[in-house]
Amino acid sequence: MFRKKKSRVLQRDVNFGNCLEDMNLQITNDFYLRKLNAPNELYEFQVTKDKEYNEKFYFAVLDHVYSWTLQNSLLTRISIPLESSPSEPHSWIYATRNWQTNENGIVIIIQSMSHPLIWSNRNLREGDVRRATVLDVIAKCTEKKLSVVIFSPSALLWDQSINFPRTTRYFTSQGLQITKKSIIKDVETPESYVSIGLNYVMSNSVSTKIHFVGSEYGSYLLNSYLDLNWKKFSGKAGAILLIMNMSINEELHDPDYVSYLIEHARNYLPSHEPCRHLMNSIMTESGIPNFSAGKYIDEFYDYIGDVLLEMIALDTNTSKS
C-alpha cells in the first residue's frame, strides 16, 4: 500500500527584515548590490538548497530594491483605480512630484512585465543598481527639467494579507491562490491598467510635449493606446523609444500614427552588432528603424537614459527647425 506523499506547504512567516542589511546585503557607495561583509562579492539568489526559501529570498531582495528605488527617486504613487483607499485592491503608477504642473515636458515609461521599477534582474546582480532600476533614467530626465511617469503593468494582483499589488510570478512562487479577492477591479488586464492610467495622466498634465518609452510587452501596450488615441494626442507627441517592439503593422490602424512611428520612433532589438548601432538591413513590418540593443537586451538597459535624451534632443531640434 502506497502512502500519499505529503506536499510541503509554503510558510508565509519567513522574515527577511526591513532592509537589505537585514539580509546581509548592501548597496555600496558606488551603487552595486553586494554582500554586506564582502562588498566585492556578488549576491546570490540561490542561498540554500531549499528552492522555496530561495524564491522567497529572491522576491525579498527585489522588494527591498524596489523600496530603495522609490525612496531615492522621490517618486509618488498614484492609485489605479483612482482614489482607492489603502486597503482596497489597487495598483500604482509612479510619478515625479511636479508631473502635473511641469510645462517643460513629460516622459511616460511603460515597463515590461518585470518587477516594478526594475529593468533587469541580471543587471541588478552584476551592474550599477541605478541603471538596473529606473533611477538613472529619472535622474537624467529631471536634470533636463522633464517629469517622469512610470507604468508597471506586471503588478495587477492584490495580496490582501499585506494590502499590496503583486505580480503573477510572485503569487506563483509564494504558493498563493489567485481568487476573486486577488483581482483589482477595473484593471484586471495590463491593457485596462495602461488605458485608465494614461487617460488620467494625459488629462492632468499641462505639458505640451510628451515623450514615450515602451519596454518589451510595454511597447505593445503603448502602441495599442497611442494607435487608438492618436488624433487626440498627436499634437503633443515627441520621441518614441521602443524596446523589442511587439506590434506589427496589421495591429496598427491609424496611418498617421504609423507614419509618425517611422519618422520619430526607434526600436531596439538584441543582435550581435554593437549596441546602439542602426541595423539598416532589418526593419519592422511597420517600418520603424531598428537599432541594436547589444547581444542581450539587459545590455541596452544600461544605456536607456542616454538614448532617450539623445532622441528627445533630436525631436526638440526638429521641432525648432
UniProtKB/Swiss-Prot annotation:
GO cellular component: ARC complex; cytoplasm; cytosol; nucleus
Major place of residence: nucleus
Keyword annotations from UniProtKB, A to Z: Cytoplasm, Nucleus, RNA-mediated gene silencing
Subcellular location: Nucleus; Cytoplasm
Single biological process term from Gene Ontology: regulatory ncRNA-mediated heterochromatin formation
Oligomer and partners: Component of the argonaute siRNA chaperone (ARC) complex composed of ago1, arb1 and arb2.
Job description of the protein: A member of the argonaute siRNA chaperone (ARC) complex which is required for histone H3K9 methylation, heterochromatin assembly and siRNA generation. The ARC complex contains mostly double-stranded siRNA. Inhibits the release of the siRNA passenger strand from ago1 together with arb1.
Protein name per its UniProtKB record: Argonaute-binding protein 2
